[in-house]
Amino acid sequence: TTLADYDVLSGPIRAAVDQGIDVIIMNSGTPEQARELGALMYVGQPEYDAGLAAGQRAKGDGVASFLCVNHYISSPSSTQRCQGFADGLGVELGNQMIDSGQDPAEIKNRVMAYLSANPDTDAILTLGPTSADPTLLAVEENGMAGDIYFGTFDLGDEIVKGIKAGTIAWGIDQQPFLQAYLPVVVLTNYHRYGVLPGNNINSGPGFVTADGLELVEKYAGEYR
């Protein structure tokens, strides 16, 4: 099961566990919450770890400073993504994360304002299509498209176009196919043979680059 709302779902999940039903938490929620509820394991993308891996990848590409465009700052997972990226780079998050809001025009304006005030920014990290799409428009308008390092969480039509065009270096795919597939495999083997992986399973981050777009497009809406 997913754990989109801990307050709403924790009771029923705990009741199922108490009745001897084996539970695996997938997609939403956290490994800590899964353990607290007595679930066998968690299969998903830990947000901090995904941000950390993205930051380490960017550091390897020469990035030392960045702008994190946070369009849902009230959610702790969003800040974890930005903090992980900063830690991966080995820098302080500080004021490199902005609360962009969710209005596309406002996001575009705030990104352009930040980059105008901080022209030496090496990279941009967006947290999904909501912030990525307006940010694409911003860097196209200010002439930074293709020059500033650009990575994003999640995939979408405009993000895929940006990767194709070379404006976006990569999109992070949490690989929901694995989130649905692996729990079935784990539970089947657990009930048949009594074997269980010793740790949670991270389904992401999977980094989608221009080289990997063919399969993403082929299976979009089906496996991807």
Regions found by a protein language model. Give the residues of each.
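Flexible loop/hinge segments that line or gate small-molecule binding clefts
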Residues: 11-49, 156-164, 168-169, 217
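Loop/turn elements at helix/coil->beta-strand transitions in domains of secreted/extracellular proteins
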Residues: 18-23, 37-39, 61-65, 90-94, ...
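Hydrophobic alpha-helical
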Residues: 1-18, 85, 100-162
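Short, solvent-exposed amphipathic alpha-helices that sit
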Residues: 50-54, 76-94, 110, 134-138, ...
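Hinge/cleft segment of the Venus flytrap/periplasmic-binding protein
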Residues: 88-89, 178-224
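Short beta-strand elements in bilobed, periplasmic/extracellular small-molecule ligand-binding domains
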Residues: 65-68, 85-105
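Short beta-strand segments enriched in small/hydrophobic residues
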Residues: 3, 40-41, 65-73
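Hydrophobic alpha-helical segments within soluble ligand-binding/sensing domains
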Residues: 41-66, 105-108, 155-159, 175-192
